[in-house]
Amino acid sequence: MQIQDQQKVIDWKDHEFDGLYDEEYRRHSLIHWTPIEVTKKVLEWLNVTRGTHVLDIGSGIGKFCSFGAIYTDGQFTGVENRLDLIEVANSINKKLNIKNAEYVHSNITEIDFRNYDAFYYYNPFCEYLSISDSIDDSISYSPEKHREYEDSVIEKFQDLPINTKVVTYCSEKFAFPDTYELKDLLFKDKLALWIKTK
């Protein structure tokens, strides 16, 4: 079934949007998928307009990118290392007739951040540290892998131009380079806006 009226989707609550997904994915919403209210604030902070290209680091089933693509005229790319989650995300694109969101099946270490204007980071490597809250059993406990991926992202953030914006969610322990300044906090300090200043 394809939903033609995207304007209606903009007004949906989380339970309505989550209803697009099968139960096996829907049950992870509270922990792993970005709430719509949070997504709207992220898009505002990143000032997403036509021509803005946003990278979602660890996009999962694509809820952030899909809603963002409907809510704004920006271009969204989600990178995800699990092919089955990308297939789910693409199925939602088809249902909602979304043309400005895409998903890349890749390891984050292989992504060139310089191809993007703004970034969203929702604790994408947490499953390497907390298996009990995992989406599936494809990821094994590995603090070393968690550190490797975070270090790769930090290094890539360092190479971006001044005024680059990054929004993090539930990522309070992420060690931003000192070239970035914290500019704002919301949602009990779980949502943070960082801007590269030097």
What are the residue ranges of the model-derived segments?
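Conserved class I S-adenosyl-L-methionine
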Residues: 51-60
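Conserved SAM-binding motif I beta-strand of class I
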Residues: 75-80
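Conserved SAM-binding loop
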Residues: 89-90
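Conserved SAM-binding strand-loop segment of SAM-dependent methyltransferases
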Residues: 97-106
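Short conserved loop adjoining the S-adenosyl-L-methionine
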Residues: 110-114
